[in-house]
Amino acid sequence: MLRTAMGLRSWLAAPWGALPPRPPLLLLLLLLLLLQPPPPTWALSPRISLPLGSEERPFLRFEAEHISNYTALLLSRDGRTLYVGAREALFALSSNLSFLPGGEYQELLWGADAEKKQQCSFKGKDPQRDCQNYIKILLPLSGSHLFTCGTAAFSPMCTYINMENFTLARDEKGNVLLEDGKGRCPFDPNFKSTALVVDGELYTGTVSSFQGNDPAISRSQSLRPTKTESSLNWLQDPAFVASAYIPESLGSLQGDDDKIYFFFSETGQEFEFFENTIVSRIARICKGDEGGERVLQQRWTSFLKAQLLCSRPDDGFPFNVLQDVFTLSPSPQDWRDTLFYGVFTSQWHRGTTEGSAVCVFTMKDVQRVFSGLYKEVNRETQQWYTVTHPVPTPRPGACITNSARERKINSSLQLPDRVLNFLKDHFLMDGQVRSRMLLLQPQARYQRVAVHRVPGLHHTYDVLFLGTGDGRLHKAVSVGPRVHIIEELQIFSSGQPVQNLLLDTHRGLLYAASHSGVVQVPMANCSLYRSCGDCLLARDPYCAWSGSSCKHVSLYQPQLATRPWIQDIEGASAKDLCSASSVVSPSFVPTGEKPCEQVQFQPNTVNTLACPLLSNLATRLWLRNGAPVNASASCHVLPTGDLLLVGTQQLGEFQCWSLEEGFQQLVASYCPEVVEDGVADQTDEGGSVPVIISTSRVSAPAGGKASWGADRSYWKEFLVMCTLFVLAVLLPVLFLLYRHRNSMKVFLKQGECASVHPKTCPVVLPPETRPLNGLGPPSTPLDHRGYQSLSDSPPGSRVFTESEKRPLSIQDSFVEVSPVCPRPRVRLGSEIRDSVV
């Protein structure tokens, strides 16, 4: 399909003359697929959108002075301390106090030394942007120390942090313990990498060279260092995004080993297209892999990789660039139910928008692909094809299992050479790990994802938190095959991407990091929904209606609840579950039954009535005295949803209702009244001060009169002024035309003559082109070009021409007399055609 799409692009770019008369039908069908809008099943909009600094969704923010690039986040085991890695600094924040204004925190400065910065600048890197120490790895190594690595001005270094006093670890001489970070941390701060610690051993996926052309998946901090083989091209310019540890040995009947999975995007060599094709991958290695004895020494003997496929279900349009992956595992014992949530973008753009997609992969599908067939490449043609012949035993790339132990193979060091030689060229699996697309967002570029499994009142739901490239946070819930975006929050200023997300599931907090700082956002905000309808229509698994307010489900105690709590994530049946008083049809609501806001209008003015809606998915319904408002000259609903009133001919009680999924609720109610002579009553019967809504230019102060009569119309004056203006312009024009009518006739007659015999301008040579003897063309311009009026030459004038040297043939002359121009003109013979008579 991609090859066809590229052919279509070249077909569209070809000149019209080169196009075939009838293009192939497949190209036309593909063009229709590319131009059609995404189906509404996957393209969703957030129900609620809140701007930055909204009081309805408060959250806390941390930022230190002169510090930027907050990229690494780590939460302590007890959840009380948040460790943050930034540019040349690390922080230990209290989750309770540090995010408050003036809160205390611990800061640890760790910058690159001056010599490394000088070398970095000498190598052509930017001193301010590149030659700094960006913290890329921040992991717990033990119960007392943290392990961290930074770019250190393109000379990556690693060190240890004492968690007790938050200082760098030192040796007996007082020097900071530093280790070479090559192979653990990238040189370039813009390069993506991933790392995790398993049983005290560090597994990383990064690049190991200054140029960034030596990628590797390695294990360090161990007595058995192992890495991928660079000469075998196991990795093709990868961009690592995530890694995960899955304890597959628990409950395994085959005696399988634990595995570490790496997620990345790379160039797919198995595809042949006109441009390099990016492919999303999942790679795995065994925890007990020690390398080979003779073949693949200190190299992985269990490295296998496969393609992750995330595409549209309708037309197969691929989202092939992996941005982030979150591993959701219920428990170590239930690792078979592990889900991998991935955020993807596309290498190609469909239309004018650059969207993203969220796909979910199951552990069952991953294991099926890694247990399937292999691919191999033909060295001569560089073509990849499926291996169908038998493979050696034990199975290449598999961990040491009970079947291998029965063959006296208890370690990878004991694997036969034929198995390892086969693996060197057969590291790519033939199958593709297919996914289920949950969400397609054409208007947002998702970059980070975090998932929390929430127990609701009746079921368990997966809540997704998605960070965008422009500082927004989407909160969505997965309900079967569908996804509902609960809310959209602007947590950072526009242009700052969300660089990291971290969940504190025990305290119900979400931490998000960007270039400018770190924010602490509560996962739930049930107090935002003030009615039963809003609480249920939100589909928020954290919230339920308690009978009087929307509360967090963790507060639900069945034995203490006086009324049953209501929650319906699947159907959101607010019309059936909420109280009857909230769902009465607006057509039968008596006027004046609901509280009405008193507003005052001035006569002959244009006014608007606001109707703010909390939900982006709801529609408005305006009623006047219980009947729907129809568009007219004096009443019109604006595109914003506000009601525009022109004049005061139609007054009464105006109500604005919100309609969403069959549920109706009153949003606003207005009772406008006309203020005579611009004077407003100070108070109404209830003692409240009425609101004056007016758009007139002259308004009267309270208790006074306007300087202009509010009820006077200037329509007649306007017509009189327009008439006088037209007369003042037309009369002088007509007078000038009548006075100069004779001149106009002469001008028009000259134009007719010129149209019959147009004259050309004389060609006068410039001075520098004249002959050196001083002789030149006659001073009188020869503008007739062989035509001369018989009476043009004045008496006594004589011009010598060729007619005086040779006899003039009268037969070759031609005289014409025009009825428009009565003066005769003569055209001479061909010999003297250009002479002056």
Curated annotation (Swiss-Prot):
Glycosylation sites: 69, 96, 165, 410, 525, 630
Sequence segments annotated as region (Disordered): 767-805
Domain PSI residues, every copy: 525-579
Gene field: SEMA4B
SMART domains xref list: PSI, Sema
Entry protein name: Semaphorin-4B
Superkingdom classification of source: Eukaryota
GO biological process: axon guidance; negative chemotaxis; neural crest cell migration; positive regulation of cell migration; semaphorin-plexin signaling pathway
Intracellular or extracellular location(s): Membrane
Cleavable signal peptide: 1-43
Membrane topology: Single-pass type I membrane protein
Transmembrane segments: 718-738
Sema domain: residues covered: 47-523
Sorted UniProt keywords: Developmental protein, Differentiation, Disulfide bond, Glycoprotein, Immunoglobulin domain, Membrane, Neurogenesis, Phosphoprotein, Signal, Transmembrane, Transmembrane helix
Reported function: Inhibits axonal extension by providing local signals to specify territories inaccessible for growing axons.
Domain Ig-like C2-type per the UniProt entry, residue ranges: 604-663
Species the sequence originates in: Homo sapiens (Human)
Pfam families: PSI, Sema
Cellular compartments per GO CC: glutamatergic synapse; plasma membrane; postsynaptic density membrane
Cytoplasmic face residues: 739-837
Annotated S-S bridges: 120-131, 149-158, 286-399, 310-359, 526-543, 611-656
Positions in the Extracellular compartment: 44-717
Family statement: Belongs to the semaphorin family.
